[in-house]
Amino acid sequence: MLTELDPALPHAVRAELAREAVDAARRGAIAPDHVSRDARERARVLSLALLGPVVNATGVLLHTNLGRAPLGAAALDSMTRASGYTNVEYRLAEGVRGSRHEHAGALLAMACGAEAGIVVNNNAAAVLLVLATLARGRSVLVSRGELVEIGGGFRIPEILAETGARLVEVGTTNRTRLSDYERARSEEVALVLKVHTSNYRMIGFVASTSVAELARFDEPVVVDAGSGLLDEATPWLRERPPWLRDELGVRQCIEAGAALVTFSGDKLLGGPQAGIIVGRRAFVDRLKAHPLARALRADKLTLAGLQAIAHAYLSGDAASIPFWRMACEPVDALRVRAEVIAAGVPGVKVVDTEAVAGGGTLPGLAIPSCGVAVEPPSVNALTARLRAARIVPRVDDDRVVCDLRTVDPADDARLAAALRATDGHSR
């Protein structure tokens, strides 16, 4: 029976799956003559559950469930070179112990015009570290319109409570003025937290207070910029894309007077998962000295990947980062690829689509795109067969759509082959 199971699985795993199938038969859960089939199905399900590459044909560039920003050759090469011994906490110039905050964090701070930086394992951890360091036992002012919930049910008030800080809600959900903050100030206030609403947008009768206005206060202003757009001007691109309108830039927050800015590494920055904190050196040094900094620190591979990403921005080569390359690929180029795929697969049509950034960024803003679509008798059957080939499409009404903006050109042939193999399920 073991030889019938996926040979990529270790022998011990295949043996355990076979035992589970036999046990199921003994309990009467399956018929005795279905043991082999049950074991094969268990192996198939496990093989698909294990981490591995997938073709993201959803049109969601920063798909959280599919790993957000894909890494390019430069970042992967940097991570590979750091996989052995590396000077993660060693100063080669002096021959003494160093700090893991001297590499990627410092370069990322330079890239957005800040004095210093530190890297932790995600942006929620970054906010947690800032609040625990600067506001434990004291009050934090937050606009009611910025008490956001991020993915997985985690909410800003709950994160704040875990740090021992006290939440002081300011203004109303739709309108918060500078005068609202003024009235809430007291000696108990440690800082003002401004949260960029990167996963939703309010329109209509709304008002908010800018970082520059808040920076007039004596209390430090901390900005959770979330999405991680380093610079609103996007100097690494030929022109600023229209779908980036109103997106908050880290550099602009620093220039406006923010004491600290936190953001994600695997969103618009285009790097590995990380939480990045940049700002004034005095505050960053306090963060580095807090016990939580060690508990939340990033590993050497993450730091190496971010170092390469920072190099790309500092050298003006960020357009080569996969996220930006895919997001800015001309629609005409996508259409040419779609026509090639459609020409080789019966029943497949070229369609204009709309991609999105995803990952809790740029809500409501679409990116014009192009892909291929199929109208099968059974949408569920076709998508299941594509997923078995590790291809994740999206479903629009009764169509299965593969949006090429999120498909690497190197995977076009693989996508076409999978669609041909499912031809019987697409008509």
Regions found by a protein language model. Name each.
Residues R27-N65, A69-L71:
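Glycine-rich, N-terminal phosphate-binding loop and its surrounding beta-alpha-beta segment
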Residues A18, A57-T58, R68-A93:
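Glycine-rich phosphate-binding segment of PLP-dependent enzymes
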Residues P7-R26, P53-V55, E187-A190, A312-Y313, ...:
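N-terminal glycine-rich anion-binding loops that anchor highly charged ligand groups
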Residues V55-G59, L268-P272, I367, R394-V400:
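Short Gly/Ser/Thr- and Asp/Glu-enriched loop/turn motifs at secondary-structure junctions
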Residues R335-D411:
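Conserved C-terminal alpha-helix-loop-beta "cap" of PLP-dependent enzymes
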Residues E94-K300, A304-Q307, A418:
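Conserved PLP-enzyme active-site core in the AAT-like
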Residues V142, T302-L303, Q307-G358:
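Conserved PLP-dependent catalytic core of the aminotransferase class-I/II
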Residues M1-L46:
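Long amphipathic alpha-helical segments
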